[in-house]
Curated annotation (Swiss-Prot), chain B:
The protein, known as: SKP1-like protein 12
Family: Belongs to the SKP1 family.
CDD domains: BTB_POZ_SKP1
Job of this protein: Involved in ubiquitination and subsequent proteasomal degradation of target proteins. Together with CUL1, RBX1 and a F-box protein, it forms a SCF E3 ubiquitin ligase complex. The functional specificity of this complex depends on the type of F-box protein. In the SCF complex, it serves as an adapter that links the F-box protein to CUL1. Plays a role during early flowers reproductive development.
Natural source organism: Arabidopsis thaliana
Superkingdom assignment: Eukaryota
PANTHER family: SKP1 (PTHR11165)
One GO term describing the cellular component: SCF ubiquitin ligase complex
Gene assigned in the entry: ASK12
Location within or outside the cell: Nucleus
Self-association state and partner proteins as the record states: Part of a SCF (SKP1-cullin-F-box) protein ligase complex. Interacts with ADO3/FKF1, COI1/FBL2, EBF1/FBL6, PP2B10, At3g61590 and At5g49610.
Protein's pathway: Protein modification; protein ubiquitination
Length: 448, 152
């Protein structure tokens, strides 16, 4: 006896909702009573990798792709009758494929995630985009095209989470404006042809979390995010700009970067806008850019956690000013100690001998320091010693070795030596110093 | 501390005494308790005793507290054994869970049936559930063509 077909529609629909789209579509052929059942399902999870793999070459067959595209079109067209709560679409498309129009006009869609390895072309057709209920939008692609940001965002009046990675600004003056946005993740590549934007403004008064990675803009005229709690900022400096960043007033430098880089001091406006923040992560490039506004750096009164990432090609010029301006810092995370030595990383590190060293550190109330990517070089060990002597309130220092790149530990005996020194530091300082090494690493570095 | 008991009556006239805290995992029963109409027992016209026994077994297991401290992992293993049932019983359970509005049991039973569908061709699905194919060959061909991508 066929018990399953006699179950109420809602129940059968619930059973189907546990299946991926392909299997749901299959049931349409079981019998007449199953023909239209799939249309009742409020959650749709479409992943074309199921039917494209393992048979390669399937995707290229036009009829298959067309029928898949039609299916998606039809699913989205059903919205008026049976609203879709959640829709996830993962598929491999050619450049010519555009997203179905219905995706941009839906009265009920709440969450949308789009991922395309090559390019996502947001349709801005005649009717424009209207997704009045959309709360979360995630777009991941090598290139996202959507027109002007202001118009784009105005289509989502209640949007709370937005992720765009990676994208290019259409105009050189752009504004991110949304009263409802709480989480924003922008991974950008400047304007067309990898050019620095002229100005980027943020009018996002409800924003709590920001992940902003992009070429440095020449100006940040408006930064309205007073409620921001946490930010990760990566202001990318192009290779042909770094010299000018370090010597902004050097007239002898012959480069094209001049005019643009001289504006980078406006980054201070971005810093001013986020000065109420509690958790801040800055990359090596960002630190270089901040060196242009050390004197005007705002005070981060609420900052408890600061993370900085270092690279050997980038300097710590901004670190003393940063530390001085965080009067309530508790936790400092340093990913990579080695950095480009200048005479401006001043008293933060021990690289250049100076008399007044350590002052920005001495007044810093940080209680816990975490050092990641430790390579076991003498320079790093000296820096660690310098921190231990200078941070007056330090209670705990955790050191984690570099797991992937080259380290000094490959030299025979180096690991044991470093471990001994760190143990010594632990004994002679008031602070708890520990060096955490995975078993496999220890074995790798001690069997020489 | 003595716990409050309520009486559930199956469609075939059998009575089952159950702790109130266990029974109100069913939203339907929970509402009746709120509306205070449980004094003479709760008649469940749509659930026969054979199924009600299983429902009560499920609810007891899922009533996690100090007396019954069970981990999610163990619950998952228990679910597997619990759902080792004849097809007809599974469908009865689905209907009971739906009627009694016990979300986790409803999801579990539906997931079990979904797992029976997944990975099978339409012919295999029909065979598993005894579904009669009432399409004409032309009609079936048309349906397959419409969702061609799913059938390849």
């Amino acid at each position: 006896m066929d018990r399953v077909s006699n179950l109420p529609d809602g129940v059968r629909g619930h059973i189907l909702s546990f299946l991926p789209a392909k299997h749901i579509a299959l049931t349409s052929v079981l019998s007449k009573s199953w023909l239209n059942l799939w249309k009742l399902i409020p959650i749709l999870d479409i992943d074309d990798s199921e039917f494209l793999h393992p048979e390669e070459g399937k995707a290229e067959r036009l009829e298959i792709r067309q029928s898949f595209v039609d299916f998606v079109d039809r699913v989205l067209a059903l919205q008026d009758d049976s609203p879709i709560d959640r829709f996830s679409l993962k598929c491999i498309t050619e450049d010519e494929d555009m997203l179905p129009q219905e995706m941009f006009v839906s009265k009920t869609l709440v969450k949308l995630k789009i991922r395309n390895d090559r390019c996502v072309d947001w349709w801005c057709g005649k009717g424009g985009t209207s997704l009045p209920m959309l709360k979360s939008l995630y777009i991941d692609s090598d290139l996202i095209l959507w027109g002007k940001m202001k118009r784009f965002l105005s289509s989502f009046p209640v949007l709370e989470e937005l992720r765009m990675a990676s994208m290019e600004w259409k105009e050189s003056h752009e504004t991110v404006s949304s009263a409802s946005l709480r989480k924003l993740s922008i991974l950008g590549t400047g304007c067309e042809d990898y050019v620095n934007p002229k100005s980027i403004s943020f009018d996002t008064p409800s924003l709590l979390y920001l992940n902003y990675s992009d070429l440095v803009a020449e100006d940040y005229p408006l930064v309205n995010m007073g409620k921001l709690l946490e930010a990760r900022i990566n202001l990318i400096v192009k290779d042909d700009q770094i010299k000018r960043v370090r010597e902004p007033n050097n007239d002898l430098l012959q480069d094209d970067a001049g005019n643009v880089v001289l504006q980078f001091g406006n980054v201070v406006k971005l810093m001013n806008g986020i000065q109420n923040i509690q958790i801040l992560y800055l990359t090596a490039d960002t630190l270089e850019v901040l060196s242009l506004c050390c004197e005007s750096m705002p005070v981060f009164n609420n900052l408890k956690t600061l993370g900085i990432k270092s690279e050997e090609g980038r300097g710590w010029q901004a670190v003393p000013a940063l530390l001085r301006n965080c009067p309530h810092l508790e936790y400092l995370i340093i990913e990579g100690l080695l950095h480009n030595v200048t005479d401006k990383c001043g008293d933060a590190c021990d690289c250049i001998s100076r008399e007044d060293k350590g002052r920005s550190l001495a007044s810093c109330p940080v209680k816990k320091v975490e050092i990641q990517g430790f390579r076991g070089t003498m320079r790093e060990i000296n820096m660690i010693g310098h921190f231990l002597r200078s941070f007056k309130c330090l209670k705990e220092m955790g050191i984690f070795p570099e797991e992937e790149g080259p380290t000094n530990f490959e030299n025979p005996g180096a690991f044991e030596y470093v471990e001994k020194i760190l143990k010594l530091y632990n004994e002679i300082s008031n602070c708890d110093v520990y060096f955490l090494v995975w078993g496999y690493m220890r074995r790798k570095w001690t069997t020489q | 501390m003595s716990s409050k008991m309520i009486v559930l009556m199956s469609s075939d006239g059998q009575s089952f005494e159950v702790e109130e805290a266990v029974a109100i995992q069913s939203q339907t029963i929970a509402h009746m308790v709120e509306d205070d109409c449980v004094a003479d027992g709760i008649p469940l016209a749509n659930v026969e005793s054979k199924i009600l026994v299983k429902v009560i077994e499920y609810c007891k297991k899922y009533h996690v507290d100090e007396a019954n401290p069970i981990s999610e992992e163990d619950l998952n293993k228990w679910d597997e054994k619990f759902m080792d049932l004849e097809q007809s019983t599974i469908f009865e359970l689905i209907l009971a869970a739906n009627y009694l509005n016990i979300k986790s049991l409803f999801d579990l039973t539906c997931q079990t049936v979904a797992d029976m569908i997944k990975g099978k061709t339409p012919e295999e699905i029909r065979s598993t559930f005894n579904i009669e194919n009432d399409f004409t060959p032309e009609e079936e061909e048309a349906v397959r063509k419409e969702n061609q991508w799913a059938f390849e």
